[in-house]
Amino acid sequence: MNIHRSTPITIARYGRSRNKTQDFEELSSIRSAEPSQSFSPNLGSPSPPETPNLSHCVSCIGKYLLLEPLEGDHVFRAVHLHSGEELVCKVFDISCYQESLAPCFCLSAHSNINQITEIILGETKAYVFFERSYGDMHSFVRTCKKLREEEAARLFYQIASAVAHCHDGGLVLRDLKLRKFIFKDEERTRVKLESLEDAYILRGDDDSLSDKHGCPAYVSPEILNTNGSYSGKAADVWSLGVMLYTMLVGRYPFHDIEPSSLFSKIRRGQFNIPETLSPKAKCLIRSILRREPSERLTSQEILDHPWFSTDFSVSNSGYGAKEVSDQLVPDVNMEETLDPFFN
C-alpha cells in the first residue's frame, strides 16, 4: 500500500460519461491542447474543492481520474490514467482518515477482505483507493430469490473465512450483513468484505462490547436483552447465521415490518427451516443461530463444518431446489442502523 501526497486538479467538462474510453479520449484532448499543464503533485496553483461537483467536472488526483459518485459524496468511480484500470475511491477528511482506517492497518491481508491499493493525501482530504467490485451479496440474493446449496456453500465459506480472519486478528465487525460483502469478479464466484470501517479493535482477548451497533434484521438476542456487555464475536456469528439462512431460504429468519415485533421474534430465537434444505445445512444454521451466545459455533468452527465438504452433485438431488416461493428479502427495509430504535 502506497501513501503519498498530491494536489487534486479539477478538469471542466460538460456532462458525464460512464464510458472510460470516452473519459480517456477527453483527458487526452485536454492534455494535448495544454502541453504545458503539469499533473505532478508539486503543482503550484490553488487547490480546487476536494470533492467537486462531478456533474460538471472530473477531478484528477495523482495518477487517477475521479468520475461520478457511487455512494453519497464520498465514494467515487475512479480510473487509472495510464492502465485504464477501474477502481473505487473513498474520500475522508484528512484529520480522521487514520482513525477510520485503523482496523485496515492492524489486520494482515486476506483474499476475502477488500484491500487498500493506494492512499493519496490532499490538503484537506485523503483519497483511499480500492479495487472495483461487481455488485453486493444482498442484491445478488434478491435477484436469485435464493441460492442452491452448492453455490451458497462456496460463497458463505468465503464470507465466514473473512470474519474468522478478523476475529483472529482482534477485530469485531459489529455491522455484518449481506450488503457488506461484494463480488470480486463478474462471474460472481468470489466475494470479499467491502470495508472494515465499522469494526472495533479489541484490546486483548476480551471481546466484550456494550454498544448496540448493527442492523435490526441481523442483530442478536443478547444485544436486545441486555443493558450491559455482550460477546462481540458471538454477535458477529449470529449475523453470519442470518446471512446463511437468507442465502438458502430467500428471506430473513426473523422478519416483521414493525421493529418492536421483529425484536420480540429475535429475542425468542424461534425460526422455521424449510424441509427442502439438506440435513447438514439445517445443522449448520441451528448451530449458529442459537439463542445462547456460548452455545454458538465460533467463526473458525463454522469453517470446519461438514456441510462445506458435501458432494453436492449427489446430495442436491432432493434438497435446495429453486422452487417458486415468495421472496421476502427487502431492498432496504430492516437494513437501517439500530440507533434510532434505542435513542
Curated annotation (Swiss-Prot):
GO annotation, biological process: negative regulation of fat cell differentiation; negative regulation of interleukin-10 production; positive regulation of proteasomal ubiquitin-dependent protein catabolic process; regulation of MAP kinase activity
Residues covered by the Protein kinase domain: 61-308
Region span, Disordered: 25-50
GO cellular component assignments: cytoplasm; cytoskeleton; nucleus
Pfam families recorded: Pkinase (PF00069)
Start-end of Polar residues biased regions: 29-45
SUPFAM superfamilies: Protein kinase-like (PK-like)
Keyword tRNA processing: no
InterPro entries per UniProt: Kinase-like_dom_sf, Prot_kinase_dom, Tribbles/Ser_Thr_kinase_40
Tissue and organ expression note: Expressed in granulosa cells of the dominant follicles of the ovary and down-regulated in ovulatory follicles.
Domain notes: The protein kinase domain is predicted to be catalytically inactive.
Role of this protein: Interacts with MAPK kinases and regulates activation of MAP kinases. Does not display kinase activity.
Matching PANTHER family: SER/THR PROTEIN KINASE-TRB (PTHR22961), TRIBBLES HOMOLOG 2 (PTHR22961:SF15)
Name this polypeptide is given: Tribbles homolog 2
Origin species: Bos taurus (Bovine)
